[in-house]
Amino acid sequence: MTDCSRCAGTNASGPNHWSERIRDIVDFPKPGIVFKDITPLLSDGPDFASALDEMAQPWRTTPLDAVLGIEALGFILGAALARELRTGFVPVRKPGKLPGRTLIREYALEYGTDRIEMHEGALPRGARVLIVDDVLATGGTLRAALGLAAQLELEIVGAAVLVELLALQGRQKWADDVPLLATLSF
């Protein structure tokens, strides 16, 4: 079982300068939205490595079969975490990007709606997975990934995000019985 004492969504142990590396982009992708850009943090090798280590730490003793990484920046974080945790990686993509048979889930965003998909046979039933994304905003994307994993009869052991936007209350849409860790909160 995962020790979720650090899953409350606060920056309890990360360096303060991590949050300084995440910049606000006003009116992106639409007017009225303030986008949290994590790419400056990703571009710094030592900070990226230490942030990944912080994200991975609670899951190190949790048996996992794969990390599900949500497009697009969840791919980067998810694949790196899968390597760190010595497990597989499965992409959760936007529609039309995966060949073969897929399952699709629609969800609401802070600024509209979107859809994500996974391969039908990506993992065997009962596989233990960790869902990873870059930012938890309204919770729609994570909730959709949770729904896809449930449709595939996967065991969701938890979710990890680099950034949680507390004002948007996305955590309230998450499953109460599934741990959710946010490394940084704004």
Swiss-Prot record:
Catalytic activity line of the entry: AMP + diphosphate = 5-phospho-alpha-D-ribose 1-diphosphate + adenine
Main localisation: cytoplasm
Keywords: Cytoplasm, Glycosyltransferase, Purine salvage, Transferase
Pathway: Purine metabolism; AMP biosynthesis via salvage pathway; AMP from adenine: step 1/1
Matches recorded under CDD domains: PRTases_typeI
Classification via SUPFAM superfamilies: PRTase-like
Subunit structure, as described in the record: Homodimer.
Protein name (database record): Adenine phosphoribosyltransferase
Originating species: Xanthomonas oryzae pv. oryzae (strain KACC10331 / KXO85)
